[in-house]
Design a protein with these regions (language model features):
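Secretory targeting signals
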Residues: 1-3
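Leucine-rich tandem repeat or coiled-coil scaffolds
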Residues: 8-190
Length: 190
């Protein structure tokens, strides 16, 4: 079993993402699921960032309990910048494109170098059925606030969004908080 996991890990690390999706035919159907293949792109991307927080998240994704085709991804205090965010965004798009897997909770809180472009990239890549989102303390301004408004409006299952400790004006905070009237089941913390 351990050898099989190591072989799969090696295969994921050496093959391009589009080739990884066929691994179950090589190893049989025992413990390798389609869900593992889908997340391989994201796991490899996180590892490629050479960052302790991302490495830990990749390990967690590899070892997670398979339940209801869902996962969480928390990258708090990862010193992620806009380039890292773009790579993560592309991997998220790949994971959620034509696949039935749910990202229940996502956080890049306390990444002050994320930037407006990084936040925009991530927001555009998150699935509409996400349950929780955190971008606390990311040094974001009103420009990003408008992206959050659009994201909250389009989200279908969002029940919590935490975006406090950023640089939003009071006017922008009020605009975001006014969305509670439309999204009554969503807790919005700005």
């Amino acid at each position: 079993m351990i050898l099989r996991r190591r072989l799969i890990k090696l295969l994921f690390a050496t093959l391009p993402a589009y080739q990884v999706l066929g691994v179950s035919s090589v190893f049989g159907n025992s413990n390798v699921t389609d869900e593992d293949h889908i997340l391989a792109v994201l796991i490899n991307t996180l590892r490629s960032l050479n960052n302790h927080v991302c490495e830990k998240a990749a390990d967690k994704l590899e070892k997670r309990v398979h339940s209801f085709n869902s996962y969480t991804l928390h990258l708090r205090y990862g010193m992620l910048d806009s380039l890292d965010a773009k790579k993560i965004s592309e991997a998220l798009k790949s994971v959620h494109q034509n696949h039935n897997i749910r990202l229940t909770s996502f956080s890049v809180s306390y990444n002050p170098t994320l930037g407006q472009d990084g936040a925009k990239s991530i927001l555009s890549s998150l699935p509409k059925n996400i349950g929780e989102l955190g971008m606390v303390g990311c040094n974001l301004s009103d420009v990003t606030g408008s992206y959050f408004i659009e994201f909250i409006r389009k989200s279908k299952n969002l029940n919590m969004i935490c975006i406090e400790e950023n640089n939003f004006s009071q006017k922008m905070k009020d605009k975001i908080l006014n969305l509670r009237q439309q999204k009554t089941s969503c807790t919005i913390i700005v």
